[in-house]
Each structure stands twice: as C-alpha cells, then as structure tokens.
C-alpha cells in the first residue's frame, strides 16, 4: 500500500537537513495548535502530536519553545488550513495542504507555481477523490506479524502492516492513528521516524525522465512555499 516509506523518510531527512524552512513551518503549526487550545501539550492533544512530529524532523527545542511562548503571549495571528489540488504531466496528480495567515497570498502563490512549473491547478475534489486518508507509523523493526498482533489486541483499526528495508510501516484508519501510537508505546516502542496523517494515492504512475524532471520541479516549488505544509502525489518513481 502506498509508496516506499523508507525512501521517503530518507529523502525527507536529507532535504530537511539542508534548510531551516522546515523549522519555520513547524513553528507555524505549533503556534496554530497552541492557539486553538491550551498551550500545554499535556492538555492539548493536537499540540502534543505536532511537537512529536517536529522532534522526528529534528526541529530544535528552542524553535518549539518559541512558538509555544508566542501563543502564550497572546499573538494575534490567525492561521487557516487549505487544500489545493492539481495535475502534472502524464496522469500525475498532486495535493498541497496549506496553513496560512493570508489566504489570498497563498492562493496566488500556489496558482503561480502550478502555472510556471508545468502543472494545472484543479477544482476542489478534482484529485483528492483518488487518494485515501490514512494514519502512517514508521519505525525500525522487522516483525510485522508481531506488530499486527499488538495493534489487534489494542483494538486498533489497522489497514496494513509491512516491512520495508528494516522499517515497520503501519497504515491505520485516520481516527485510530493516536490509538495505534499509544499501543506501540505501551509495548515498549518509543522511537518513530514517522507518525503522520497522510493522503495515499489509490494508484500510482511512473513518469519518463523528462516528465519526472518537470514534476519534481513542481513538487519542490510547492514544498518551498512558506504556506505549504504538506505535498502528496501519485508518482511512484519520485
């Protein structure tokens, strides 16, 4: 099910290590989560989850603390979530999820990126119906059957458990992601490389080298935009 998560984690780590942009994006997400509830992660499940993901991405503690302190201090910025869908070359599809304090700016920027990078922005729902929402948990391991038993005993709604290059990859129903993480922690598994709500393509395409270069430029440009938090696509060889 889905793309090779071991490769995705490796690429993400390499890219994140080369830029501080990921820190800024997590800072915004942490601030927004803290503003929507209590600025204490022990009292705010959403905030706690974002902080855990930030730590997986090796976001420094001072960045996390600064975002929480800003929320405690009564920062007046309001952030709105958004989703933009579109198409690349030869059946490739892409979804960009955003978190922004200026929706008009974000719409203009995303539309410009699609136009300049060989894509076409689509209407809401034009792409997302070809993706499934899922919780994804990835950690080092080699016994998917044992992990499945742990999750089954905890009554976690699991779609699939696989082993990829020394990593256990778990797909859960979106509503059971946190339950799955809790069950694994109770079983002594505490180090995760990914704990995310993701959109998984129902089917994938492989692009030619020429089309892949265009599509990769589109993905990179979207990921580099300050307001874009996540990018999903259906290209198997990226």
From Swiss-Prot:
Belongs to the TACO1 family. YeeN subfamily. The keyword Membrane does not apply. This is Probable transcriptional regulatory protein YeeN. PANTHER family: TRANSLATIONAL ACTIVATOR OF CYTOCHROME C OXIDASE 1. The keyword Protease does not apply. The lineage of its organism: Bacteria, Pseudomonadati, Pseudomonadota, Gammaproteobacteria, Enterobacterales. Disulfide bonds: none annotated. GO terms for biological process: regulation of DNA-templated transcription. GO terms for molecular function: DNA binding. GO terms for cellular component: cytosol. Keywords: Cytoplasm, DNA-binding, Transcription, Transcription regulation.
């Amino acid at each position: 099910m889905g793309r090779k998560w071991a490769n995705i984690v490796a690429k993400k780590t390499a890219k994140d290590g080369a830029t501080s942009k990921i820190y800024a994006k997590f800072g915004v997400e942490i601030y927004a989560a803290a503003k929507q509830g209590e600025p204490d992660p022990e009292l705010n499940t959403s905030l706690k989850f974002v902080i855990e993901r930030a730590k997986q991405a090796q976001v420094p503690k001072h960045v996390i603390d600064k975002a929480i302190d800003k929320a405690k201090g009564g920062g007046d910025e309001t952030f709105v979530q958004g989703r933009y869908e579109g198409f690349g070359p030869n059946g490739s599809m892409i979804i960009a999820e955003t978190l922004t304090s200026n929706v008009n700016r974000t719409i203009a920027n995303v539309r410009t990126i699609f136009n300049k990078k060989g894509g076409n922005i689509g209407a809401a729902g034009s792409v997302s119906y070809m993706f499934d929402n899922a919780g994804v948990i990835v950690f080092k391991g080699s016994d998917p059957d044992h992990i499945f038993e742990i999750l089954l005993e905890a009554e976690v709604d699991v779609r699939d458990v696989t082993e990829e290059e020394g990593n256990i990859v778990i797909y859960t129903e979106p509503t059971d992601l946190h339950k799955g993480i809790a069950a694994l922690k109770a079983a002594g598994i505490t180090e995760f490389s990914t704990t995310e709500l993701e959109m998984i393509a129902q089917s994938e395409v492989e692009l030619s080298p020429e089309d892949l270069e265009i599509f990769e430029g589109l993905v990179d440009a979207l990921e580099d935009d300050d307001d874009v938090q996540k990018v999903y696509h259906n290209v198997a060889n990226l």
